[in-house]
Amino acid sequence: MGKNEARRSALAPDHGTVVCDPLRRLNRMHATPEESIRIVAAQKKKAQDEYGAASITILEGLEAVRKRPGMYIGSTGERGLHHLIWEVVDNAVDEAMAGYATTVNVVLLEDGGVEVADDGRGIPVATHASGIPTVDVVMTQLHAGGKFDSDAYAISGGLHGVGVSVVNALSTRLEVEIKRDGYEWSQVYEKSEPLGLKQGAPTKKTGSTVRFWADPAVFETTEYDFETVARRLQEMAFLNKGLTINLTDERVTQDEVVDEVVSDVAEAPKSASERAAESTAPHKVKSRTFHYPGGLVDFVKHINRTKNAIHSSIVDFSGKGTGHEVEIAMQWNAGYSESVHTFANTINTHEGGTHEEGFRSALTSVVNKYAKDRKLLKDKDPNLTGDDIREGLAAVISVKVSEPQFEGQTKTKLGNTEVKSFVQKVCNEQLTHWFEANPTDSKVVVNKAVSSAQARIAARKARELVRRKSATDIGGLPGKLADCRSTDPRKSELYVVEGDSAGGSAKSGRDSMFQAILPLRGKIINVEKARIDRVLKNTEVQAIITALGTGIHDEFDIGKLRYHKIVLMADADVDGQHISTLLLTLLFRFMRPLIENGHVFLAQPPLYKLKWQRSDPEFAYSDRERDGLLEAGLKAGKKINKEDGIQRYKGLGEMDAKELWETTMDPSVRVLRQVTLDDAAAADELFSILMGEDVDARRSFITRNAKDVRFLDV
């Protein structure tokens, strides 16, 4: 019996020791105000006749979640799958935020499950007012939990309060082990239904352990990505000063582990039955520990570690109000892009919100006043803009709000209006004090902003030049653009193609109704190493900005986007990958909403062409696919051409128009990889490493990831 089977056997219900059997109270449990009502659409031909009481379906309890999972976790793809982990971890971190937990352990189990344990107070097990164990209320009813009681949690995260009950709803099995009230307790949920709470051995410890196995019938994939989990947990550790978070991946075999090896996994939570079933011999797994005594200061150091800071000290301050807290850490670097990351109750607010608005307003006001008072700006000079001041700024803003109001189902923007004035007041006071107390560093910061303003003025002139130049072209579009006939952006695609040769083949092979082609003839500038005025003088950048129509930075307007699919098509070699990375850096730094809204894709041209005797050729997009096609063809009795049976494409230019259409551009067969942005801080770091000035950091990154095949695909 394997260790997971042994654990499940140990947790199987023994009705002789059941403290409370909630199955008897299901009717009472389901009759809650949180019942979701959904209209079941009848068939069109019967809709008018049969639409009545029978057409209204009440989705009771967690059935509503399984019926519409996207409403609760955003999607059923990789992002939604990982959100299950975030929900359980958020509950554990809530205990740390409340001052009751110091350690959170997360384990990716070898059988595909996930285990999250904390040393907090433990989920309550006493009988709830509804007549069932409180743990069952938490696990089986939406909008139930301690986060709704300000006495239990002053501040908490979680996805609109639905939390762990949604995890239970979307799992085939969920197990809970609790240490509380002097005993160990356990409960198992099979397809969301509780099997019976069991009381175990006496203990003086406290804490909760939750294990779950995502339902493959709900999710497109049930395979978790270690790096995605690691980034999120590291972020949580930064935001909770002093908290220790351990991540262990039991799916990794000893042979796969390179430099993240431990021989003793005692920190990972194990039940007594697991330990008894396991061998006592040490084994190797992949693990990481995140612990940051400096909190946000360490976060800013992490962001700036591949960049050159222009002042040594990190600005760090905090403030408290009624129902509000804010902590901010910040430092300027010599780069040209801002890296401001905002959080509310440890939730990453990718779209910002009122906390960021308050910070920006105060920062702009304080810097301008200081610059004028110290004569670093003349009275007749125009004020520095927010963009000028935030050039090269790395900052983390973390607020804690007792009654947060988030815009959007997945909490990406904070909406509390009172938070803006609160943050603005704290920042005005603290930033004024820092600038007054650090005149040398302050002068460096102001001078950088002044230099940025000068570049902004030059960039405006460059923009006007681009606009005037565009106006001389037909329709105001770049001359090299082969536009499509469709005028509907939702149906239109823009292929940005490397090289004239491939551009010519793409123009000939495309469907001109909806596919536009923009060939890049010269090398695009590396925007990571250039200020905006230099960037806008680059001919290829001008062509891309004009073709897309959205503008850049503060002038960006996604409503003016001319193509809803932007496909980057480059050679499948190192040079092609470099071109793609340059283009992605441009879009990330100057037109980030294009990525955030899912408009950017990478084309996947084939690597190989298999030429069969008396049969149509086949195309392979990887070495594995090439070997598979070759093996299958030979088994089927096909014969490969002797001289040029397997052709490896060195570039797009080697394919004629027909081949390019059939392999890379035909919507019915092509493979496109959508570029997504789940973690802005991680993306910012990656672009800085790959395209920045730090050669050692880039070499280290390449060395670490050389064996990871994912990075061969850009």
Swiss-Prot record:
Q: What does this protein do?
A: A type II topoisomerase that negatively supercoils closed circular double-stranded DNA in an ATP-dependent manner and also catalyzes the interconversion of other topological isomers of double-stranded DNA rings, including catenanes and knotted rings. Relaxes negatively supercoiled DNA in an ATP-independent manner. A linear reaction intermediate can be trapped in the presence of the antibiotic ciprofloxacin. Negative supercoiling favors strand separation, and DNA replication, transcription, recombination and repair, all of which involve strand separation.
Q: What are the protein's UniProt keywords?
A: ATP-binding, Cytoplasm, DNA-binding, Isomerase, Magnesium, Metal-binding, Nucleotide-binding, Topoisomerase
UniProt organism field = Mycobacterium bovis (strain BCG / Pasteur 1173P2)
Q: Where is this chain's protein located in or outside the cell?
A: Cytoplasm
What is the protein's given name? DNA gyrase subunit B
Q: Where does Mg(2+) 2 bind?
A: 571, 573
Q: Which GO terms describe its cellular component?
A: chromosome; cytoplasm
- Activity control mechanisms: DNA supercoiling is inhibited by EDTA, novobiocin, coumermycin and ciprofloxacin.
Q: Does the keyword Coiled coil apply?
A: no
Q: Which cofactor does it need?
A: Mg(2+); Mn(2+); Ca(2+)
Annotated Mg(2+) 1 binding lies at 498, 571
Name of the top EC class for this enzyme = isomerase
* Cross-referenced InterPro entries: DNA_gyrase_B_C (IPR002288), GyrB (IPR011557), HATPase_C_sf (IPR036890), Ribosomal_Su5_D2-typ_SF (IPR020568), Ribsml_uS5_D2-typ_fold_subgr (IPR014721), Topo_IIA (IPR001241), Topo_IIA-like_dom_sf (IPR013760), Topo_IIA_B (IPR000565)
What does the annotation say about its assembly with partners? Heterotetramer, composed of two GyrA and two GyrB chains. In the heterotetramer, GyrA contains the active site tyrosine that forms a transient covalent intermediate with DNA, while GyrB binds cofactors and catalyzes ATP hydrolysis.
User: What SMART domains does the entry give?
Assistant: HATPase_c, TOP2c
Keyword Magnesium appears in the UniProt entry: yes
Q: Where is the Toprim domain?
A: 492-606
Against NCBIfam families, the record matches this protein to:
gyrB, PRK05644.1
Entry's Gene Ontology molecular function annotations: ATP binding; DNA binding; DNA negative supercoiling activity; metal ion binding
